[in-house]
A protein has these predicted regions:
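N-terminal glycine-rich FAD/FM-binding segment characteristic of electron-transfer flavoproteins
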Residues: 1-128
């Protein structure tokens, strides 16, 4: 069974500062962590793997700072971690992110099951 999990890096909430000129989160001011809902998705995928066998592949989109969360997923028991990165994706909206992750699964698949968190704490759109 090929199980995929999408994870997102988010800023540590207690460290967030706002840029008062652009009214955006200053991500450079905060550490990062795996989105908690995505962490639960990884745990659920690993539970399914323990029952049915197969492999768990964790995917994220971002720069090298995302590698910490991917290593965390590997330490939890994921078999493979994939970071998709390209300067063209910098600042990508949720639709672009969803399309890129979908294309990655199609290339790596076939996918028998895909897990995601229900929403991220930093955007809460629940669209990817």
């Amino acid at each position: 069974m090929n199980i995929f999990v999408f994870v997102k890096q988010i800023p540590v909430i207690s460290d967030i500062r706002m840029n008062h000129q652009t009214f955006t989160v200053d991500r450079s001011s905060a550490g990062s962590m795996m989105n908690p809902a995505d962490l639960h998705a990884v745990e659920a995928a690993l539970s399914l793997k323990s029952v049915l066998g197969g492999s768990v592949t964790v995917l994220t989109m971002g720069d090298e700072s995302c590698d910490v969360q991917l290593r965390e997923a590997i330490a939890m028991g994921a078999d493979t971690a994939v970071r998709i990165t390209d300067d063209a994706y910098t600042g990508a909206d949720t639709l672009v992110t969803a399309k890129v992750l979908t294309a990655a699964v199609r290339r790596l698949g076939p996918a028998d099951c895909i897990f995601t968190g229900h929403a991220s704490l930093d955007g809460a759109t629940g669209q990817t």
